[in-house]
A protein has these predicted regions:
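Beta-sheet-rich non-transmembrane sensory/scaffold domains
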Residues: 1-178
Length: 178
């Protein structure tokens, strides 16, 4: 469990309470289990009845339109120019074989837990959002030429308040979307 994203703060001996299986697929003697809120896939050996491994899925670089614009039929065209990171957070899952290899396909669904504790760990990036590292805020300001956290820029984007602090100093060094 050391490498899993555990969104609710607990004492280490109780971290297992926040591992939440979502979907399961099987291939031979293995069951693959999506752990959505933990942003991981677990592997369970069916005959041995034991967990073999968990694979944290990390963060993915994304280019999206996080603005408050509606797109082609609205006030302006979609502008895919916002660079953020996203959590895959796998939901449904299937497996298939090609030759001797097993592959997994997931439908990813970034979503904070519905509990009050986890909902506090997801905020809009706007004016009252999470604290940003000053150098990161400056880079965003240079990119947007104005306040990057206006709704017309990144302000409406729902971000994690725990996944973008890459240096552990308490502020976000990268925006990580759900």
């Amino acid at each position: 469990l050391e490498n899993l994203r555990i969104p609710v703060a607990r004492r280490p001996e109780y971290r297992y309470l926040d591992v939440e299986p979502e979907f399961i697929t099987t291939a031979r003697d293995l069951a693959y289990v999506t752990l959505q809120e933990n942003n991981a896939i677990g592997v369970f050996h069916l005959r041995k009845r034991a967990w073999v491994k968990t694979y944290p899925l990390g963060r993915l670089p994304l280019v999206i339109d996080a603005s408050d614009r509606d797109g082609p039929f609205g006030s302006r065209a979609i502008a895919l120019n916002d660079q953020v990171h996203g959590l895959p957070m796998p939901d449904s899952l299937t497996s298939f074989r090609i030759g001797s290899r097993t592959y997994l396909a997931t439908a990813n669904e970034g979503d904070p837990l519905s509990s009050r504790k986890d909902s506090m760990r997801a905020k809009r990036a706007g004016a009252h959002g999470p604290s940003l590292d000053p150098s990161y805020r400056q880079r965003l300001k240079e990119r947007y030429g104005s306040d990057p956290l206006l709704d017309a820029n990144l302000g409406r984007l729902q971000v994690s308040t725990i996944d973008g602090d890459t240096d552990g100093d308490g502020d976000l060094d990268e925006l990580t979307a759900f």
